[in-house]
Amino acid sequence: MEETLKSLSMDYLNLLINGQAFSDVTFSVEGRLVHAHRCILAARSLFFRKFFCGAAADQAAAPPGALLLDHLSPRSPSGGASASSPRGAGGSAAAAAAATPGAVIPVSSVSYEVFLLLLQFLYSGQVSLVPQKGEPRPGCGERGCWHTHCAAAVDLALDTLAAARSFGVEELALLTQKQLAGMVEKASIEDVMKVLMASRKQDLHQLWTTCSHLVAKSGLPPEVLAKHLPIDVVAKIDELRLKSMSRRSPFLSHHHHHPHAAAAGIEASSAAELDDHHKIRRMRRALDSSDVELVKLMVMGEGLNLDDALALHYAVENCSREVVKALLELGAADVNHPAGPAGKTPLHVAAEMVCPDMVAVLLDHHADPNVRTVDGVTPLDILRTLTSDFLFKGAVPGLAHIEPNKLRLCLELVQSAAMVMSREDAQTAAVNAAPIYGESPGGGGGGGVYNASGTSSSMVNLSLDNRMVYLNLGMDAQFGKMNDGGDGDDGGSRGPSSLFSPHGFP
């Protein structure tokens, strides 16, 4: 029986694939013609049944998806539009288009790809919402991406969900919701918030619950969430966090018979969290005004943790090179600290910004060019992808302000640092494999003894010195100036960038 149903499904799908074979209705989507069959669409969709039967002539009785059909003004097969009718007469024009043989029905507000997915489901009862593996997508800049949970896959699923609900195809809507629920578990926090807002708009309670809990677990402070979400949604996220803290509170588990003590514990936790938010806000204001001394006092006197506060990430993206350099020289921040669900380091952020100043100062302070995000992406991978996009596409979407020379310089700096680190690792391995004692390198037969680990240390220090010399020479060649003071550099060479990039950094 199952094989018979599969065969039937494929037979109907072949009707759609074969285009004009036995077709009796034609749609125009984004300037491309889609041939279909009235009987199948009417049998599978209440919307199309009403539409083809002329019920859409009455705007009040028209199904919700009728608005997607461009008020259904009929066109000739050649694509020419008929004389425009008043807005209120759009439904009558729709009925005329549906009843006129050879008329082309224009479809608006739905992309060609989404409309085909909708028809594919109506014909066969099954559909794949994952874009083709490795296919370049507007919302995904990663080469060879499998598009299982990237921004492009999430956008396609959201568009399909909206179309399914508008056209009244509830089975497809449920299927898409399940797929989105799986996607958001691995998606970037920006995409999770995007799905959260879509589920709120369409009253999808289960998807809303999944996404709201993921956002609550992300650790993003309320002031950050407020930049992306409405205030009432931020308030609900805070409520979820308080409930989560109350469940984890030791007062509740060990002193459940003391409700006042439990309440006091929750209140203390909330107060501590609020205090941390205030510290982070003050730290950012200090960095914005280049007051690194105040940040130092907060570290020493208030116990501010620069890594937990993402101080270096914030400074790289919003402050000048001097501020980043001074912050690194405090010695209280880990230059390779991963942040956010994606696990990006400050060097990842600088690479995405294509800012040679920031890349150089981070590498000068021993940022690791080989460190990987959760998805296995290194800063070098980011720059190579951007360079490839420039070579093959001529521009990078969303980064039109980037200059090719700066991109090339960033790539050279990070490549050089990666090569130096590779040589250092090879030298260290070779020295460790050598005998611990042997003749003095100077010869002379005097029975001199040298320590291999000491030699290794000097080799590594020499390599690091060479690396810094290269970086400074590279910056001198590009900008004509680059010294420890960095006079006149206010970080203005960077293009505008958001602290919360499309790549998943919170």
From Swiss-Prot:
rRNA-binding keyword on record: no
UniProt keyword Phosphoprotein present: no
Pathway field: Protein modification; protein ubiquitination
Binding site for Zn(2+): C140, C145, H147, C150
Localisation: Nucleus; Cytoplasm
GO molecular function annotation: transcription cis-regulatory region binding; zinc ion binding
Domain of life, per lineage: Eukaryota
Keywords: ANK repeat, Cytoplasm, Metal-binding, Nucleus, Plant defense, Repeat, Ubl conjugation pathway, Zinc, Zinc-finger
C2HC NPR-type zinc finger locations on the chain: 137-151
UniProt-listed SUPFAM superfamilies: Ankyrin repeat (SSF48403), POZ domain (SSF54695)
Region (Disordered): 481-506
Broad class of the protein's primary localization: nucleus
Pfam families, per the entry: Ank_2 (PF12796), BTB (PF00651), DUF3420 (PF11900)
Residues in ANK repeats: 278-306, 307-337, 342-371, 375-409
SMART domains cross-referenced by the UniProt entry: ANK, BTB
Gene Ontology terms: biological process: induced systemic resistance, jasmonic acid mediated signaling pathway; plant organ development; regulation of DNA-templated transcription
PROSITE patterns registered for this protein in UniProt: ANK_REP_REGION, ANK_REPEAT, BTB, ZF_C2HC_NPR
Subunit composition and interactions: Homodimer. Interacts with TGAL5, TGAL7, TGAL8 and TGAL11.
Family of the protein in this entry: Belongs to the plant 'ANKYRIN-BTB/POZ' family. 'NOOT-BOP-COCH-like' (NBCL) subfamily.
Role description: May act as a substrate-specific adapter of an E3 ubiquitin-protein ligase complex (CUL3-RBX1-BTB) which mediates the ubiquitination and subsequent proteasomal degradation of target proteins. Transcriptional co-regulator involved in the promotion of leaf and floral meristem fate and determinacy. Required for the abscission of senescent organs, probably by regulating the cell wall disorganization in abscission zones (AZs, e.g. pulvini at the base of leaves). Maybe involved in defense response against pathogens.
Name this protein carries in UniProt: BTB/POZ domain and ankyrin repeat-containing protein NPR5
Gene this protein is translated from: NPR5
